[in-house]
A protein has these predicted regions:
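N-terminal catalytic cores of NTP/NDP-binding nucleotidyl/phosphoryl-transfer enzymes
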Residues: 1-59
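Residue-level signal for inorganic ion chemistry
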Residues: 15, 67, 106, 166, ...
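A structural preference for short, hydrophobic beta-strand core positions in alpha/beta folds
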Residues: 38, 78, 138-139
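N-terminal Rossmann-like or analogous alpha/beta NTP/dinucleotide-binding catalytic cores
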Residues: 47-132
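Glycine-rich, Lys/Arg-enriched anion-binding loops that position phosphate/diphosphate groups
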Residues: 129-231
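Phosphate/ribose-recognition catalytic cores of enzymes acting on nucleotide-derived substrates
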Residues: 183-296
């Protein structure tokens, strides 16, 4: 069995606090000749325990992508948070990680809890690791502007559409990776074709409105974008939230391909226009704003 150094946590947003933990994981893995790994769950434990939906900053796809791309984590383990996992005693939980995944070292945040009824804490983690000859690092909280970096705080920024402040606390831009879907092609009728993405279930949609974005294509290219998040009130009566992006200077068909949209700045709230021509003029103005953003 290959040796692993395992980062413990849920990692929603993969923010600066998580980054400190994941960097230490990669560092320890290099020292020990092990694989840097992260152990997390396929859904929030709170959602299972309370039965209430929990809205996350990122999909599992984006959580994994951020950990791999930014911090060099080579193995992300999404364990099902089921009844067996929920009722597993904390000691059995650690023994499972060692026996099943070859853990030789753990890295956890200062407030990490684990095991049945969250009975395990970092003091018990240190104690158990010492007994078993396993290494352990506990990472202190990271602060920004006197505020502790947390997923909870960053969710409020994303919901408010404050993408620049969110990026400061995340350590990277907020992103959405999804497969391009067929839309109604209304953008084409006004000379502004868009690619359409869906917001995954139980993932936060940013505040409705228009954003400057940068879009990463499957072939490695990147394009400036103008992205509308919302219900498209000018052309639709549906309350379904969609993410539609116009790619500046791009021509081609991206249906069925996966894109990553990174949110840079919110330009305005979502508006209802009386005519498609008025909508077209406003989008053209937003395109000019996006061009100016990337030229600055």
């Amino acid at each position: 069995m290959e040796k692993t150094v395992i980062a413990l946590g849920f990692f929603d947003g993969v923010h600066r606090g998580h980054g400190a933990l994941l960097r230490k994981t990669a560092e320890r893995a290099r020292e020990l000749g092990a694989v840097p790994a992260a152990f997390t769950f396929d859904r929030p434990p709170k959602e299972v325990v309370t039965g209430q939906p929990v809205y996350l900053i990122n999909s599992n796809r984006d959580r994994q992508g951020l950990m791999e791309r930014l911090y060099g984590i080579e193995r992300v383990i999404f364990a099902p948070f089921d009844r067996e996992m929920m009722t597993m005693p904390w000691e059995a939980y650690l023994e499972m990680l060692i026996g099943t995944y070859g853990a030789v070292h753990f890295v956890a945040g200062h407030d990490h809890r684990f095991g049945h009824k969250n009975a395990g804490n970092v003091q018990l983690l240190r104690q158990k690791c010492a007994e078993m000859g396993i290494g352990c690092d506990i990472i202190p909280p990271v602060q920004r502007e006197g505020i502790t970096v947390s997923s909870t705080y960053i969710r409020t920024l994303v919901e408010a559409g404050d993408m620049e402040r969110a990026a400061d606390f995340l350590g990277h831009r907020h992103c959405l990776s999804q497969t391009v879907q067929h839309g109604q092609r209304i953008g084409r009728t006004i000379g502004i074709p868009t690619v359409n993405l869906a917001v995954p279930e139980h993932v936060l949609a940013p505040a409705h409105g228009v954003y400057v974005t940068e879009v990463f294509l499957p072939d490695g290219r990147r394009c400036a974008g103008v992205t509308n998040v919302g219900t498209r009130p000018t052309v639709s009566d549906s309350d379904r939230v969609s993410v539609e992006t116009y790619l500046l200077g791009f021509e081609g068909d991206l249906y069925g391909q996966e894109l990553r949209v990174e949110f840079c700045r919110r330009l305005r709230g979502e508006q209802r226009f009386d005519t498609l021509e008025a909508l077209r003029r406003e989008i053209q103005r937003n395109i000019q704003q996006a061009e100016a953003y990337f030229e600055a």
